[in-house]
């Protein structure tokens, strides 16, 4: 709707359709529980076997509770992940605060399963103040303006999870809270 760059994706609300789709996919890809999953609902899958296990966690094992009743299967994006924190208000004001980078993987060297976060640092050295302003204008401002047009008043923290790819920055997620562990 807003032409914000993000991964190509499809959504499914049942096991059979998601498995049928996966049989036509190339890997790696990402499977996400479509809801709050304590930072553990994103699974990078390198094979059909990995994907089947992820789909089973969502639909059969109910590992993520109601968050796993709908899944997002999306293109795997490669690059540097950055959390962009801004304050916004319902007038369209956007104040970029800081960028941070967290370490999600359970094992050293960014290996293993995702966790809620193993630690973070801020600011991200590769993101200058000028680049941070550009990212805010590209990713946050269009959403804030859209909310305003829809008569949705939002004031507060807006956190954009981004990945800087060879094709340019892409949106991974948005939250309306401070990040954890980034704010620690």
Language model region names:
Residues 1-41:
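A conserved helix-loop-beta module that forms one wall/lid of the active-site cleft
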Residues 41-183:
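Internal nucleotide-binding/catalytic subdomain
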């Amino acid at each position: 709707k807003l032409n914000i760059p993000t991964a190509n994706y499809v959504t499914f609300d049942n096991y059979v359709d998601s498995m049928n789709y996966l049989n036509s996919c190339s890997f790696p890809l990402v499977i996400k529980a479509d809801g709050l999953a304590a930072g553990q609902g994103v699974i990078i899958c390198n094979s059909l076997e990995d994907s089947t296990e992820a789909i089973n966690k969502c639909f059969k094992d109910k590992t993520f509770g109601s968050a796993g009743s709908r899944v997002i299967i999306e293109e795997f994006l490669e690059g540097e992940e950055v959390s962009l924190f801004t304050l916004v208000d319902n007038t369209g004001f956007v104040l970029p605060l800081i960028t941070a980078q967290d370490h999600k993987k359970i094992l050293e060297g960014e290996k293993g399963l995702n966790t809620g976060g193993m630690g973070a640092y801020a600011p991200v050295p590769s993101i200058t103040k000028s680049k941070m302003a550009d990212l805010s204008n590209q990713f946050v401002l269009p959403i804030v303006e859209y909310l305003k047009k829809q008569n949705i008043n939002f004031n507060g923290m807006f956190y954009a999870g981004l990945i800087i790819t060879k094709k340019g920055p892409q949106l991974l997620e948005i939250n309306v809270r401070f990040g954890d562990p980034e704010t620690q």
